[in-house]
Amino acid sequence: AALVYAIAPFRDAAVLSAGHSGNGAFWLNHQTGKWCGTTYYGEYPWWLSQYNDGQSPDFRIKEMEWNPLHPITSYTFLPEWRTIPFKYRFETEKDNKYRRLITSPLINDEVNRVTEDLLDKSNIGKDDITDLLAITYYAGNYNHRSTQECAMEMQDTYARLDQSIARLLDMLESKVGLQNVLLCIASTGYA
């Protein structure tokens, strides 16, 4: 039978992507920093429990930092908007650190890490039956701020999204071969 998995920063995106007959839908718990799912799809996979025990964001959040990927001169925005480079760390504001991580482009790296673990440790893509892996990345405003407040962050998010997609393609090439992949990219239109 076909395997259907969904990995997303948010619960609704994961569940909607896996559908009613999926094998698993996983998202980052905004309170614990661990990947979670729902019992609707059956048992929680051993590989994700193992991942959570040593590699989930809650182990690395203190070292995570989001700075501009490119020199500040490569970002464009209105002159009256902030032109000072941003720097976000996620170990502060204890109650919101994972929510803020989820609304940063760093969450897309986390989605890729879990995706790679799924590809390595599950049976998805390992037989002649077509499987579905639905990946959701985040490309919205940081911490739900206005575009005016975070113009540089938005541009950086898109630059990092490009890198995340490139890493995903490299991963798929090495794990299952791109000749065996049908890739569809769409926007939800909401953040």
Regions found by a protein language model. Give the residues of each.
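His/Asp/Glu-rich, glycine-adjacent segments
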Residues: 1-129, 138-145
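N-terminal targeting/docking segments
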Residues: 95-96, 149, 163, 176
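Alpha-helix capping and helix-loop boundary segments enriched in small/acidic/polar residues
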Residues: 102-106, 145-159, 184
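Extracytoplasmic/secreted proteins, especially bacterial periplasmic and envelope-associated proteins
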Residues: 106, 110-114, 153-156, 160-167, ...
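Short helix-terminating capping/connector loops at secondary-structure junctions
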Residues: 125-130, 176-180
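Structural motif
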Residues: 132-136, 184
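Metal-dependent active-site segment of extracytoplasmic phospho-/sulfohydrolases and closely related
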Residues: 160-191
